[in-house]
Amino acid sequence: MKLVTVAATALAMLASEASAQSKSLKDRLLGTWHFVIAEVTAPDGQKSFPFGPKPRGILIFAPEGDFAQIHIAGEVPKIASSNRLAATPEEYAGIMRGTIAQFGTYTVDEDKQTFTMKFTASTFPNWEGTLQTRSVDKLTDEEFINTNPQVGAGRGSAYNLYRRAR
């Protein structure tokens, strides 16, 4: 009986994976994803984690082609005054280093297995109006990994892991 249960479970998992693979890349990206980790690899091979070991965040792909993305480091300084408009320069700097938020539109290239985001607005205003393309390295019903091949200022490439929100 155990063998039958194990075999049935394995077949169900394979069928689920095959069904997911038959959908378009865009259809598989749609929805809400929780940010798990970002790992940047510098040109010299050195790795860093710009949002720390336990970041928080979300990436949303809407069917009409809009996206919203927020990445926050696990440890962002609190503002002592409790007034977001009256932080110290050090508090503002710590917050800026540990967060990024942006929204805009996206397109998907099914053949290349990439998606390109056009930034309408960002907490890093230099990105506004720009395009950034990410490769889709892994995409299942539960997990999504993409790579940004060119992190700003020649810092290398970034690997980003997300888990689907449930």
Model-derived segments and their meaning:
Residues K2-A15:
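Bacterial N-terminal signal peptides
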